[in-house]
Structures are given as structure tokens and as C-alpha cells.
From Swiss-Prot:
InterPro entries per record: Bact_transf
Designated name of the protein: Uncharacterized sugar transferase EpsL
Gene this chain is encoded by: epsL
Lineage, top ranks: Bacteria, Bacillati, Bacillota, Bacilli, Bacillales
Family classification: Belongs to the bacterial sugar transferase family.
Signal peptide positions (record): none
Role description: May be involved in the production of the exopolysaccharide (EPS) component of the extracellular matrix during biofilm formation. EPS is responsible for the adhesion of chains of cells into bundles.
Organism from which the protein derives: Bacillus subtilis (strain 168)
Length: 202
């Protein structure tokens, strides 16, 4: 895993340099069109479920109803935010998470802390490796496949990891981003919540 960490650091620095103009432009656009804060921050489970703060570009407003409840995602997602998501630009701040060691470039996506007690024993194995910006599930359906299938693919990655597999995933990710494939579930602007799929791990 030392090779994986060295590659993550080198690639993250390189990608931050290459995308610096895009990042700065996006910061300006988000601040102008959506407002502050520019970054969306949320606590997610990392390696072995240890919490860390995930960074993304903000794509939604904080509009609320008369009772103070957030409006549905499809209402709060702006046209600017939709474009940022389509181009996967919202994920670029996660390169900072890679530098910090919270994320790897490749690994199971970090989901919500609320999901931890809902996993089966097998599904929980996805946390045996560091989470990533992209992963085996992302190039095999992303948000267009079921939660159970995603977790199955995540565990397959854990059991079959190799440096060359990571390179393959990164190359295929570039193609997926270019064609904007599988970004959202049908009729959902964000992934539908996971509510469990059987006997959970103790």
C-alpha cells in the first residue's frame, strides 16, 4: 500500500496543478451563482469507518420551507450545480482529501455515517481499504445500479486490489466522465438513501 499512497500523493499534486484554473473559475462561479460557502463539507466514514470531513463544490442552495425544512434536492439543485455535477467538477476538492490521506484516488466511495449500522457483515468489508474519489462500482454503473450491486463491486475491489487495477479504473473513469454516464439514478438528482438489505453486521 506504500506504492498506492505515493501514487496518490504524486497524482493529486499533478491533478491539482492541471485543474487549478478550473478550480479557481468554479469557486468564482459558485460564489456568484449559488453563494457562500463555496464548498460543501460533510463527515463521512473513512478507513475502518473512521470519520473525516469530505470536501465537494456546493451545487445546491439552502432553500427551506415555511417550517424551516430543506426543500427537495431537485428544487435546490441549481442549473449551475447541475452542470458542475455533469462534468464531475464537484469532486475536484476531494483531491485535498487525498493529500491529507483521508481518501485514495481509487477505492469504494465514502457514503454517509448513517449507513454504517445498516451494512451486512460482508458489505461492511468495503471499509477495509481507504475510500476513493472513484472506484470499481463507479465504472460499472455508478448511481445507475442498486446499492447491493455497488457494495458487491466494492467488496470485489477489496479482495482483488492491485496497482494495475487502480490504473485501469482511473483510465475507465476518464471515459465515464467524458460521456457523463451513470451520474444520477433514474428520476433522482441525488442517490436514493440506503435503508439496509438484510441481516446487519453486529
Amino acid at each position: 500500500m506504500i506504492l498506492k499512497r505515493l501514487f496518490d500523493l504524486t497524482a493529486a499534486i499533478f491533478l491539482l496543478c492541471c485543474t487549478s484554473v478550473i478550480i479557481l473559475f468554479t469557486i468564482a462561479v459558485v460564489r456568484l451563482k449559488i453563494g457562500s460557502p463555496v464548498f460543501f463539507k460533510q463527515v463521512r466514514p473513512g478507513l475502518h469507518g473512521k470519520p473525516f470531513t469530505l470536501y465537494k463544490f456546493r451545487t445546491m442552495t439552502d432553500e427551506r420551507d415555511s417550517k424551516g425544512n430543506l426543500l427537495p434536492d431537485e428544487v435546490r439543485l441549481t442549473k449551475t450545480g447541475r452542470l458542475i455535477r455533469k462534468l464531475s467538477i464537484d469532486e475536484l476538492p476531494q483531491l485535498l482529501n487525498v493529500l491529507k490521506g483521508d481518501l485514495s484516488l481509487v477505492g469504494p466511495r465514502p457514503l454517509l455515517m448513517d449507513y454504517l449500522p445498516l451494512y451486512t457483515e460482508k458489505q461492511a468489508r468495503r471499509h477495509e481499504v481507504k475510500p476513493g474519489i472513484t472506484g470499481w462500482a463507479q465504472i460499472n454503473g455508478r448511481n445507475a445500479i442498486s446499492w447491493e450491486k455497488k457494495f458487491e463491486l466494492d467488496v470485489w475491489y477489496v479482495d482483488n486490489w492491485s496497482f494495475f487495477l487502480d490504473l485501469k479504473i482511473l483510465c475507465l473513469t476518464v471515459r465515464k466522465v467524458l460521456v457523463s454516464e451513470g451520474i444520477q439514478q433514474t428520476n433522482h438528482v441525488t442517490a436514493e438513501r440506503f435503508t439496509g438489505s438484510g441481516d446487519v453486521s453486529s
